Amino acid sequence: MGLHLRPYRVGLLPDGLLFLLLLLMLLADPALPAGRHPPVVLVPGDLGNQLEAKLDKPTVVHYLCSKKTESYFTIWLNLELLLPVIIDCWIDNIRLVYNKTSRATQFPDGVDVRVPGFGKTFSLEFLDPSKSSVGSYFHTMVESLVGWGYTRGEDVRGAPYDWRRAPNENGPYFLALREMIEEMYQLYGGPVVLVAHSMGNMYTLYFLQRQPQAWKDKYIRAFVSLGAPWGGVAKTLRVLASGDNNRIPVIGPLKIREQQRSAVSTSWLLPYNYTWSPEKVFVQTPTINYTLRDYRKFFQDIGFEDGWLMRQDTEGLVEATMPPGVQLHCLYGTGVPTPDSFYYESFPDRDPKICFGDGDGTVNLKSALQCQAWQSRQEHQVLLQELPGSEHIEMLANATTLAYLKRVLLGP
């Protein structure tokens, strides 16, 4: 509650006390009432929140596949759907279909996919609703926030989205995100801290670059970036060429490749020329080398020409030279062998030999450090924090990460 002094009572206060009260009112931070912590919005990365699907399909790829369901079911993450044979059903349902005419994606016939839990944290705390440790994602961080006095679904909320798509196809999501931020500002008396991981940072940057500076100054207190692929990631070329099963032995890389290629967000995360040298060879074969200037031929040679169109659709979505326009805390992992380039004896349908560089195991250090360029391009602070030995996913539960986040939210 605010301090209300009735006019006829003011004269009864001693001069010293009146001066003290006025001084305290002037010095109070108008952005956040005393004793309150800033509300938090969590933005997950690629594969970083649950998806649900409902089926009414004209045909199926295998007699074991469900053709029709009465209600929505979890399509990501449900480990049972990734078993041999059943995974064919899963891929046919979760893939996107690219329309060359409209330059947009759509769901397969008879499949409807939705994102559960916008404004809640459950769909990004655990990717698997059974809450198995395999699917644990933001859980440790949210538990820490609760321990610091936050409440799930109130002053800490999740902003899940359809991570298969790039931002240009998720317009309603950004409208909902803006509305939620404004609502939290009103409910909790101050600007919001955005905490994003991996590709969620690119989504957040896309969002912030499209908001007026006055809006950002009012509603955003800080942006905490974890493992951001600002300049794209080298491993994307391997994902597109031969697939990547993320070391899950029951999933064949070529099997999962179809789904990975159909997600426009995959091509969006290819390395960018504002971070990488145009001379750098990312993929080497016995007959040809591919740099970032060779993407069109790369897509032709892997038999996925729609990928070149997807890249053209998404390459300019984020303006590299345009800073977010808010206080930025850029946390990045180092010291973990990270795929840097690939050599294929047989291209593209066999696993390559991998040359490693520095990074967090997924995001190359060169890409993560792109945020340094903004230090001279905005008035707001851009602070970098190295996380030595911190792997891309594990950094969310890293003690250093959590201690840093606590300082941002609650002070020293």
From Swiss-Prot:
Q: Which reaction does it catalyse?
A: a 1,2-diacyl-sn-glycero-3-phosphocholine + H2O = a 2-acyl-sn-glycero-3-phosphocholine + a fatty acid + H(+); 1-hexadecanoyl-2-(9Z-octadecenoyl)-sn-glycero-3-phosphocholine + H2O = 2-(9Z-octadecenoyl)-sn-glycero-3-phosphocholine + hexadecanoate + H(+); 1-hexadecanoyl-2-glutaroyl-sn-glycero-3-phosphocholine + H2O = 2-glutaroyl-sn-glycero-3-phosphocholine + hexadecanoate + H(+); 1-hexadecanoyl-2-nonadioyl-sn-glycero-3-phosphocholine + H2O = 2-nonadioyl-sn-glycero-3-phosphocholine + hexadecanoate + H(+)
- pH dependence per the entry: Optimum pH is 4-4.5.
Q: What keywords does the record list, in alphabetical order?
A: Acyltransferase, Disulfide bond, Fatty acid metabolism, Glycoprotein, Hydrolase, Lipid degradation, Lipid metabolism, Lysosome, Membrane, Metal-binding, Secreted, Signal, Transferase, Zinc
Annotated GO biological processes are: ceramide metabolic process; diacylglycerol biosynthetic process; fatty acid catabolic process; glycerophospholipid metabolic process; phosphatidylcholine catabolic process; phosphatidylcholine metabolic process; phosphatidylethanolamine catabolic process; phosphatidylglycerol metabolic process
Query: From which residue to which does the signal peptide run?
Result: 1-33
Q: Name one GO cellular component term.
A: membrane
Tissue distribution: Detected in blood plasma (at protein level). Ubiquitous. Highly expressed in heart, placenta, skeletal muscle, kidney and pancreas. Detected at lower levels in spleen, thymus, prostate, testis, ovary, small intestine, colon and peripheral blood leukocytes.
The reported result of mutating residue 235 to A is:
No effect on phospholipase activity. Abolishes transacylase activity. Has no effect on association with membranes
Keyword Acetylation in the entry? The reply is no
SS bond list: 65-89
Key word Cytoplasm present? no
Subcellular compartments: Lysosome; Secreted; Membrane
- Residues annotated for Zn(2+) binding in this entry: 198, 340, 355, 392
- Activity-regulation annotation: Inhibited by zinc ions at neutral pH. Zinc ions in plasma may keep the enzyme from hydrolyzing inappropriate substrates.
- Provide the primary localization: other
**Might you give the EC number(s) for this enzyme?**
2.3.1.-, 3.1.1.32, 3.1.1.4, 3.1.1.5
- For this protein, what post-translational modification is recorded in UniProt? N-glycosylated. N-glycosylation is important for maturation of the enzyme and normal subcellular location.
**Which residues are substrate-binding?**
46, 199
Q: Which PANTHER family match?
A: LECITHIN-CHOLESTEROL ACYLTRANSFERASE-RELATED (PTHR11440)
Entry similarity comment: Belongs to the AB hydrolase superfamily. Lipase family.
What's the protein here called? Lysosomal phospholipase A and acyltransferase
